[in-house]
From Swiss-Prot:
Belongs to the phospholipase A2 family. Its cofactor is Ca(2+). It comes from Homo sapiens. InterPro entries: PLipase_A2, PLipase_A2_Asp_AS, PLipase_A2_dom, PLipase_A2_dom_sf, PLipase_A2_His_AS. Residues 32-42 form a propeptide. Disulfide bonds join 53-111, 67-157, 69-85, 84-139, 90-164, 91-132, 100-125, 118-130. It comes from the Eukaryota. The active site is at residues 88, 133. This is Group 10 secretory phospholipase A2. Secretory calcium-dependent phospholipase A2 that primarily targets extracellular phospholipids. Hydrolyzes the ester bond of the fatty acyl group attached at sn-2 position of phospholipids with preference for phosphatidylcholines and phosphatidylglycerols over phosphatidylethanolamines. Preferentially releases sn-2 omega-6 and omega-3 polyunsaturated fatty acyl (PUFA) chains over saturated fatty acyls. Contributes to phospholipid remodeling of very low-density lipoprotein (VLDL), low-density lipoprotein (LDL) and high-density lipoprotein (HDL) particles. Inhibited by methyl indoxam.
Length: 165
């Protein structure tokens, strides 16, 4: 395979604004269909479902945002969205300390009129985890999106993080 054509980087630069716009468009759960009752069983991807149910943006917009949105997290949260993700990390840590498995535990929830309704819960872990995801969905829905924190370089995030409540 030979070297990349010179025009390829230019094409990527031209496409970048369109790709960023896609990240900010409403998610699949934000239209008329979200007003219909939907019942979900959670896997790791259902966190995205709760965020998509409540929020104005696709959940993908939060995958690599700031210092805390996405896998792992450390440092000082950069804005309100990052604080939502920090709070969610803390909530999952409390759930793990209670013996729950946040990334694999399943629970029932409903999306009704862009609101997450938890339950019915079969145990305390299901109740805790649904509340964690419900809280971040509601938190993110009230924030302003700052493109400068999308794909934020992790090396700019400090090693120490704020303590959880």
């Amino acid at each position: 395979m030979g070297p990349l054509p010179v025009c390829l980087p230019i094409m990527l630069l031209l496409l970048l604004p369109s790709l960023l716009l896609l990240l900010l468009l409403p998610g699949p759960g934000s239209g008329e269909a979200s007003r219909i009752l939907r019942v979900h069983r959670r896997g790791i991807l259902e966190l995205a479902g709760t965020v998509g149910c409540v929020g104005p943006r696709t959940p993908i917009a939060y995958m690599k945002y700031g210092c805390f949105c996405g896998l792992g997290g450390h440092g000082q949260p950069r804005d309100a969205i990052d604080w939502c993700c920090h709070g969610h990390d803390c909530c999952y840590t409390r759930a793990e300390e209670a013996g729950c498995s946040p990334k694999t535990e399943r629970y029932s929830w409903q999306c009704v009129n862009q609101s997450v309704l938890c339950g019915p819960a079969e145990n305390k872990c299901q109740e805790l985890l649904c509340k964690c995801d419900q809280e971040i969905a509601n938190c993110l829905a009230q924030t302003e999106y700052n493109l400068k924190y999308l794909f934020y370089p992790q090396f700019l995030c400090e090693p120490d993080s704020p303590k959880c409540d």
